[in-house]
Design a protein with these regions (language model features):
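A conserved structural/catalytic subdomain of Rossmann-like adenosyl-cofactor enzymes
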Residues: 212, 216-218, 222-448
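Short small-residue beta-strand/loop micro-motif enriched in glycine and branched aliphatics
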Residues: 107-110, 171-173, 352-353
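Generic hydrophobic, helix-prone segments enriched in Leu/Val/Ile
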Residues: 34-37, 176, 198, 258, ...
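Conserved S-adenosyl-L-methionine
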Residues: 116-233, 238-240, 247-255, 267, ...
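Short helix/loop capping segments that flank catalytic or ligand/cofactor-binding pockets
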Residues: 89, 162, 186, 353, ...
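Non-catalytic, mostly N-terminal accessory regions of nucleic-acid modification and defense proteins
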Residues: 1-136, 200-203, 209, 315-318, ...
Length: 448
């Protein structure tokens, strides 16, 4: 049975049983819930989901000072959830969407901490829209199937699920993610399950991306190394790291050099890019500094450009994230790309202002994706820039160098302007003479 449905849960641990215990204020609810968590981790999913509920502490004094108080609190909370769920459909799409909504609401309320685990859905939609288009001929539309998609800083998994939503439930062979934070790692696994993704269809690894702790990614045989059709990521911005000397010879970095200790942005980028297939697409969110900073970052950026790997640079509005108000960019990379230019999209002015965060509306997202797909040129919005021009700019990718949003001032005709001033002065003289005539009739002082 497990082979067919992938997991088995005993009747006592089903939601309906737990909810009934809560309604009847059953004194064994807490014990049953803990036993259910242990069963799911150790037996229901075998070793695949070991530690899934490790961050849930049912003995926390926040629930109550003793067992009875904690049990009563759990009864109240679970009954309220059960009563609420009765009003909605219980299919996996609804449950998954509800879970995603709660993650989003938690992110909105947790401020800067949200950047550790959540990518706003509007931005996820842009990245997923890009990587699901045909890599060599985006204008031909979306791919029918992706063998694999990879997010090496997956947080709660929302970005990976956005790609899956775009491709459909059977459009991706394998969803692969990696997350360093244990709590967020568990959130991602739960998120997959609640969206109906089978345990055989995804793999989330808990470990450090930069040190490459995942054994399957450390395979030295190129023929056996994993490669992905699509790579998406929203890594921590300008993360401080301590690269060892040995990392300089790491297969991910040795052709480009190490990112500076003060900002691991390019280290994250090179990690994902290394595992991209030859015909794959990578879309990564980064701070604007990667476009123009000097030193080691300039050397990495220059080599990526000279090798023809940077396909598109997209500038987004400021204050889109819960964790930071700075504007960010999306870099689209390919190992084999047809155009010998770089597409720049300056979407910084296209947003709806909100009280706490700015928002991208569907039309803003569609405009970005349509411009990328058809490589359109538009005044003050997008431009295809040749490598010769980029070389002249010192391989600086600052978007405003190529696509300025400033409106061109209209040319002033000096002769015409002079004539207008003469006409105005003559009109003033005529009006004053007429006014003085009235004043004279009234016996009043005239205007000088």
């Amino acid at each position: 049975m497990r082979r067919k449905v992938h997991y088995v849960i005993q009747p006592a641990y089903l939601w309906s049983s737990i909810a009934e215990m809560a309604r009847t204020q059953n004194g064994e609810l807490l014990h049953t819930l803990q036993n259910g968590f242990d069963y799911i981790e150790n037996e229901s999913f075998a070793s695949t989901f070991d530690g899934l509920f490790s961050e849930i502490n049912l003995n926390s004094e926040k629930l109550g000072k003793d067992y009875t108080a904690r049990n009563a609190t759990l009864c109240t909370v679970i009954k309220a959830i059960a009563d609420g769920l009765e009003k909605f459909s219980t299919d996996k799409d609804t449950l998954g969407d509800a879970y995603e909504y709660l993650i989003g609401q938690f992110a909105a309320g947790s401020g800067k901490k949200a950047g550790e685990f959540y990518t706003p859905q509007q931005i996820s939609s842009i990245l997923s829209g890009i990587v699901t288009l045909d890599s060599q001929e985006p204008a031909t539309g979306q791919k029918k199937h992706l063998e694999s998609v990879f997010d090496f800083a997956c947080g709660s998994g929302s970005l990976l699920l956005n790609v899956r939503h775009r491709m459909g439930p059977h459009g991706i062979g394998k969803i692969v993610g990696q997350e360093k934070n244990i709590t967020t790692y568990n959130l991602a696994r739960m998120n997959m399950l609640l969206h109906g993704v089978k345990d055989s269809e995804f793999e989330i690894y808990h470990g450090d991306t930069l040190t490459n702790e995942w054994d399957s990614l450390r395979e030295m045989n190129p023929a056996k190394q994993p490669r992905f059709d699509a790579v998406v990521a929203n890594p921590p911005f300008s993360y401080r790291w301590e690269p060892s000397e040995a990392l300089g010879d790491d297969m991910r970095f040795k052709n480009y050099g190490l990112a500076p200790k003060s900002a691991a942005d390019f280290a994250f980028l090179l990690h994902g890019f290394h595992f991209l297939k030859q015909d794959g697409v990578m879309a990564i969110i980064l701070p604007h500094g990667v476009l123009f900073r000097g030193g080691a970052e300039e050397r990495i950026r220059t080599k990526l450009l000279k090798d023809g790997h940077i396909d598109t640079v997209i500038g987004l509005p400021a204050n889109l994230f819960f964790s930071t108000g700075i504007p960010v960019c999306i870099l689209v990379l390919k190992k084999c790309k047809k155009p010998d230019d770089v597409l720049f999209i300056n979407a910084a002015q296209y947003f709806e202002k909100g009280k706490r965060q700015n928002r991208l509306l569907p039309e803003h997202i569609d405009k970005i994706l349509d411009t990328y797909q058809h490589r359109r040129k538009e005044d003050r919005y997008s431009m295809r820039v040749s490598m010769e021009r980029i070389e002249k700019e010192g391989y600086n990718l600052n978007i405003s160098r190529y696509v300025s949003t400033a409106e061109v001032e209209a040319a002033i005709d000096l002769a015409d302007t002079h004539q207008q001033l003469v006409d105005i002065e003559q009109a003033i003289v005529r009006s004053k003479d007429k006014h003085n005539a009235f004043l004279k009739e009234l016996g009043l002082s005239l205007l000088p």
